[in-house]
Amino acid sequence: MYADIIIKNAKCITVNNKKVFEWLAIKDEKIIAIDNGEKYNSLINKTTIILDAKGKSVLPGFIDSHFHLVQTAMNEEGVNLHNVSSFEEIGEKIKKANLKSKETIFGVRLEKENLQEKKFPDRKVLDKFSDDTPIWINNLDYQVSILNTYGLLYYKIPFRIDGIELDEKGAPTGIFTGKANATLRTNILNSYSNKNREENIRKLIPKLLEVGITTVNAMEGGYMYSDKDANFIYEHIADFPIDIVLFYQCLDLDKVREKKLKRIGGSLYIDGTRGARTAALTFEYNDKPGEMGRLIFSQKELNVFVEECYINKLQLSLYTIGDRAIETALNAHEYALEKTGIKGLRHRMEHVELASLPQIKRAEKLGLIFSMNPTYERYWEGSNKMYSERLGKRYVETNKFRETIDSGLTLCGGSDSDVCDYNPFVGIHSAVNHPVKKHRISLYEAIKMYTINGAYAIFEENNKGSLEIGKLADIIILDRDIFEIDTESIDKVKVLCTIKSGKILYNTI
């Protein structure tokens, strides 16, 4: 038997253990050999492709465990407002966009904390930039939408819906939160065609391959999103060159069963976000005394739902940010386990930003998986950033990666794209360089978050996630030996080649 592809002169990091090999061979879609020396010569014929890694690292393809695929793809077409620092800069970008199109001007990823005004622009501010075209702006975590006056009239959202901010005269300011924001977002997202979805996903995938992503956990549908997104992914899941694992973000077990899906949830909200001060805490927000966030479900409601997931043997993934939400989710899992005795479903908790040490220990005892987002630390950690503004001195308690791993819990990593950068090296860098030293993990542990642990979190550890004979040839070749660089340079690492199921889909070697 001859190999289709040989990667030689490499440092192949197996990830399932700490062994490093010099070469590997691929036939069809699988790894057929991995070893040291020059034994690969017997596997070469005239059609074998030989890739010389020149001493650089070779890793399994990355698995992003929390990725809003349709949302990210569609938002690539939007006006990126993440780094703007003033209303004036917003205006410059909107005016530039208005020259290109008379359709809705869609702004994404706006952070109030980055603005010198320290508040969101209202409709009157946006009207100065365009008064004859709808403007729709989302903040970074999608908890806030902003419309100009034309947009208010165009989208016809009833003014009596909860979450529509009113000025002193009782007129809408154009700023939508809560139910109003969710209604507006869902209405607009429902208007997208499947042709739009497909075209934009196909444009996005080469960018994912360029950073080494070969599998995404697609969090689609449900509150604040569109079920049309989830249905599109379900119907077209095999049409794209990377692996897509659908997490249908709904409460409808019948719908999930009809589709024969093995899991439910994703961003299935138990609470809100820190930015909007809706993440459910056991203490008051530092910058808003009296506010402790909110729970979406009562304990009784969540107990019933979680028990039903156990009974139906569905892997459940719950969105939990604040410690009070984490407590509620753990209570529900303990209730369901006691009622049913069913184990081994690898239920997940997403984000888990403020878990206490006792909560981490309880989660480990329950056999739960933490799906966390290290890049949050890059965006919001630090004494003058959003975590410290919202949490005060407790900002040092966020994202306990070290403690999670030490407890024995499986920890997988995701970007939460497009809230954060989907480049896995940014996530790995953030986990290794957590601003709070005691929460940091090693480079090897961080790589496992995006490879073998990500595979385990979707029951795929026997098929992918490590470089082993018989596993899928999901492989990336880096531009350097990642274990020989300074930890401060991890986010500078590039991918030279991405192989998915034995096919070279990105290559600059």
Identify the residue ranges that each predicted region occupies.
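Short aromatic-centered micro-motifs
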Residues: 25, 268, 498
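Phosphate/diphosphate-binding loops
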Residues: 239-260, 264, 346-352, 357, ...
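Non-cysteine beta-strand/loop elements that form the S-adenosyl-L-methionine
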Residues: 68, 262-278, 368-378
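Acidic (Asp/Glu)-rich catalytic clusters
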Residues: 237, 256-259, 342, 363-365
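Flexible loop/turn segments at secondary-structure boundaries
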Residues: 113-115, 144-145, 216-217, 223-229, ...
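Glycine-enriched alpha-helix->loop->beta-strand junction motifs that scaffold or abut catalytic
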Residues: 259-262, 362-371, 407-410
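Divalent metal-binding segments
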Residues: 2-8, 13-240, 246-251, 275-308, ...
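His/Asp/Glu-enriched, well-ordered alpha-helical/loop segment
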Residues: 307-317, 324-347, 352, 372-482, ...
